[in-house]
């Protein structure tokens, strides 16, 4: 069982297209399109498991997509951006209760990309730590042709998410 911490509404701001070299283009065609973000929860006390592997991440998304299709709240077309997955990856030593620094991966638009991106990022973080380095709290993007994640920007504070509760909507708890 994977818990859901919150579901909130956002607006799409657009899409960055990374082209040759260090150039990027901005596509505003989706600007203003409403988004529903689902944030998962790991809470052993409440019986909610964590996602431990790329296989589990892909399976969770497959099941979540089925539920969203059944409820009629999404058409689930990942290739068109109707359903996206932006996993946060954090590893920890076996037996430790503390997770390490978290990275977020953007641009995962298929179940295969979710599997490959999560698998790569777990291996990358393991390699960084094994070589004596430090994992940086950052947003990374999935580069499908190269099958690697690439740094987009660092995240110093949780406030950088610019998440503001809507004062006219009361929080609701579902069981």
Residue ranges and their predicted role:
Residues 1-175:
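Basic, nucleic-acid-interacting segments
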């Amino acid at each position: 069982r994977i818990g859901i911490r919150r579901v909130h509404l956002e607006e799409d701001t657009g899409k960055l297209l990374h082209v040759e070299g260090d150039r990027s283009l901005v596509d505003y065609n989706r600007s203003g399109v409403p988004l529903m973000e689902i944030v998962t929860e790991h809470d052993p006390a409440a019986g909610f498991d964590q996602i431990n592997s790329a296989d589990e991440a892909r399976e969770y998304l497959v099941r979540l997509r089925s539920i969203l299709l059944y409820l009629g709240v999404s058409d689930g077309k990942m290739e068109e951006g109707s359903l996206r997955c932006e996993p946060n990856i954090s590893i920890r030593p076996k037996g430790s209760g503390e997770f390490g620094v978290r990275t977020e991966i953007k641009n995962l638009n298929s179940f295969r990309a979710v599997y490959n991106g999560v698998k790569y990022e777990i291996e990358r973080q393991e390699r960084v730590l094994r070589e004596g380095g430090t994992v940086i709290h950052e947003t990374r993007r999935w580069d499908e042709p190269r099958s690697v994640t690439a740094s987009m920007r660092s995240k110093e504070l949780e406030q950088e998410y610019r998440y503001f509760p809507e004062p006219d909507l009361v929080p609701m708890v579902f069981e």
